[in-house]
């Protein structure tokens, strides 16, 4: 249930032959039959159900019950933004007088601005890389009773920092 979704595309290509209106370097039409395309996409966040209590999300084998805060799907993830670009150039390859081929060479860059788009969060904090367990006052006795509490905190923070909570770069 994404409420708002925007997409814009800008495409510009130089022509060939007499239609070419681009730069000429050393007598050559360097951008002849070349083009650029930029695509911008943006969207409002999707819903999730916020929980009121902290649970141990990154530990396996732990079955904590979560308590709903607010209404079902009453919270929203942040907006997402992505800018991508594609540059291309066509080349004509003449094999013989009657036989020729077209070759299109392009470079495509996804997520040009390297935006960190959040696609999932921990329901208690609304944060993509912290479930709140390590700083929860109620969890401190359990954490301090571990064989090595500092090691537990370090390894738990690694497990909570899940790259799957972000879109691909």
Language model: regions and residue ranges:
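Membrane-embedded beta-strands of outer-membrane beta-barrel proteins
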Residues: 8-10, 85-87
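C-terminal beta-signal and adjacent terminal beta-strands/loops
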Residues: 17-20, 24-64, 78-82, 89-169
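Extracellular loop and loop/strand-boundary signature of outer-membrane beta-barrel proteins
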Residues: 70-74
């Amino acid at each position: 249930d994404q409420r708002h979704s925007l997409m814009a595309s800008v495409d510009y290509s130089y022509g060939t032959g007499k239609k070419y209106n681009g730069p000429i370097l050393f007598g050559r039409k360097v951008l002849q039959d070349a083009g650029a395309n930029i695509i911008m996409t943006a969207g409002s966040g999707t819903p999730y159900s916020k929980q009121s209590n902290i649970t141990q999300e990154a530990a396996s084998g732990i079955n904590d019950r979560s308590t709903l805060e607010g209404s079902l799907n009453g919270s929203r993830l942040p907006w997402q933004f992505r800018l991508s670009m594609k540059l291309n150039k066509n080349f004509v390859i003449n094999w013989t007088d009657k036989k020729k081929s077209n070759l299109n060479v392009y470079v495509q860059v996804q997520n040009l601005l390297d935006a960190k788009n959040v696609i999932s969060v921990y329901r208690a904090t609304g944060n993509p890389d912290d479930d709140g367990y390590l700083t929860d006052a109620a969890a401190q006795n359990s954490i301090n009773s571990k064989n090595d509490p500092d090691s537990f905190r370090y390894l738990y923070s690694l497990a909570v920092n899940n790259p799957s909570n972000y879109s691909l770069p």
